[in-house]
Regions:
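Substrate-recognition/specificity elements adjacent to catalytic centers across diverse enzyme folds
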Residues: 3-10, 15-199
Length: 199
């Protein structure tokens, strides 16, 4: 009888551990989501740092000032640094929105939210925004390298922010949907702009 209780307690513990760490349909792993170290509790505050910011690849000093409405004002010595800082700050405050909208534009939303978005994805793929974004980048590679350089600087800023994130620092939406951010690219910027003009 003593061993029977031990086996039952062990099986219950293993069962609870399994359930708390398994994605159940659209529900994220509850244990992972509620983990006090890396779960949703880490998303309590969003710091806004006024002053000099440090981003890999900057040529000169870049400063950011947040006004009373928490709108960042970026001051840079050159355009390349300005676009890197803008990408970094946009990712800091809107990373999930950036990625979700580019997935929606490219017809990849079902990768994040499941089969319920398949009709949306098919419609967007027929619309051809991903192809249009590729063509826009190809045109810039041949005809407008300056703009492409700025778009690459913006992507570098977004990626600098993504690279510094640990899983516990991911925005809460990533934790809810149980996935991680992808690297940003100029194509994603073109997709985002095309998607915004569609709205």
């Amino acid at each position: 009888m003593k061993y029977f209780k031990l086996v039952i307690a062990f099986l219950l513990t293993v069962g609870i551990f399994f359930v708390l760490n398994t994605k159940l349909g659209a529900i994220p792993p509850i244990g992972k989501f509620l983990n006090p170290y890396s779960g949703v509790w880490q998303n309590e505050t969003d710091e806004t740092t006024t002053g000099i910011i440090s981003i890999p690849g900057l040529k000169d000093k870049v400063s950011v000032h947040y006004d009373e409405q928490l709108i960042p004002h970026v001051f840079a010595q050159n355009e390349s640094d300005l676009y890197k800082a803008q990408g970094y700050l946009t990712a800091k405050h809107r990373l999930w929105q950036l990625e979700f909208q580019t997935h929606a534009a490219a017809g990849r939303l079902s990768e994040i939210v499941g089969e319920g978005a398949l009709n949306h994805d098919r419609r967007e793929r027929r619309r051809g925004m991903a192809y249009g974004a590729e063509q826009a980048i190809a045109y810039m590679e041949k005809q407008d390298t300056e703009t492409l350089g700025f778009i690459q600087d913006y992507a570098d800023g977004v990626n600098a922010y993504i690279k510094q994130l640990d899983p516990q620092d991911y925005p809460v939406e990533y934790k809810l949907l149980d996935y991680q951010p992808e690297a940003w690219s100029p194509k994603k910027t073109a997709l985002l702009l095309m998607y915004m003009t569609k709205m």
